[in-house]
């Protein structure tokens, strides 16, 4: 009986998870629902779970003192992305931008639901949602940090596969647009990336034309 009392006492003294920890748990659980998988070192992982981890890692590197709300926005960047497939929208640039806009709104709405469950106030939720929608890019340092992380994740992990599926001119065009969205600090990091020889050659060509 005394042992049980001690164990219950110890349990009651354990710190409760913070609202930030609760939010991350909820967010990551949603990411694990992604039906698309990526194999890394022989292990199949949900693609969006991997993306979220990579985004968080880059923000930690770019801005070690990043605010709690920026960290949450970064983690929510592709929340339930698979629920709105690209083929719902017309082909071409206009359809692509319509899809991206719909995605950003959906990610922000889904994030709001989870953050309320975790105990965040409406002002904090609104700030996270604005970051997810990338509002005031270039004017807002936190929005720029999120965008930098997204660009670096693309260059480090997405570029080789994209380059294999598209013609060189299209890839170079995308790389130039990506580069134009990045801050000077992010560009420095990009130049230090260990890219495949083909990806590096494409990036060099893109930068030569900027």
Language-model segments: which ranges?
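Short coil/turn segments at secondary-structure boundaries
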Residues: 39, 85-88, 144-146, 190-191
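N-terminal amphipathic/basic-hydrophobic helices that include classical n-h-c signal peptides
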Residues: 1-12
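Histidine/acidic-rich helix-loop-helix segments that form or flank divalent-metal centers
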Residues: 74, 121-152, 156-159, 163-166
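Divalent-cation-assisted or electrostatically stabilized phosphate/pyrophosphate-binding catalytic cores
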Residues: 89-110, 166-192, 199
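Long hydrophobic alpha-helical segments typical of transmembrane helices together
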Residues: 193-210
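His-Asp-centered metal-binding catalytic motifs of divalent-metal-dependent phosphohydrolases/nucleases
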Residues: 68-87, 91, 107, 111, ...
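Active-site flanking loop/helix segments enriched in acidic
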Residues: 19-56, 89-98, 102
């Amino acid at each position: 009986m005394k042992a049980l009392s001690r164990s219950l006492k110890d349990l009651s003294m354990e710190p409760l998870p913070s609202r930030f920890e609760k939010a991350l748990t909820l967010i990551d659980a949603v990411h694990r629902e992604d039906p698309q998988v990526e194999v890394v070192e022989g292990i199949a992982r949900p693609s969006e779970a991997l993306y979220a981890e990579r985004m968080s890692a880059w923000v930690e590197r770019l801005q070690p003192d990043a605010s709690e709300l920026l960290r949450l926005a970064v983690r929510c960047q592709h929340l339930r992305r698979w629920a709105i497939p690209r083929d719902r929208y017309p082909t071409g640039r206009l359809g692509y931008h319509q899809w991206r806009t719909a995605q950003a709104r959906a990610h922000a709405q889904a994030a709001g639901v989870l953050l309320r469950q975790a105990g965040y106030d409406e002002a904090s939720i609104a700030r996270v949602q604005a970051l997810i929608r990338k509002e005031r890019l270039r004017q807002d340092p936190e929005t720029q940090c999120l965008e930098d992380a997204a660009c670096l994740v693309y260059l480090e992990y997405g570029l080789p596969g994209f380059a294999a599926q598209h013609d060189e001119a299209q890839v170079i065009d995308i790389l130039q647009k990506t580069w134009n969205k990045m801050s000077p600090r992010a560009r420095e990091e990009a130049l230090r990336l260990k890219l495949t020889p083909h990806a590096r050659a494409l990036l060099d060509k893109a930068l030569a034309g900027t």
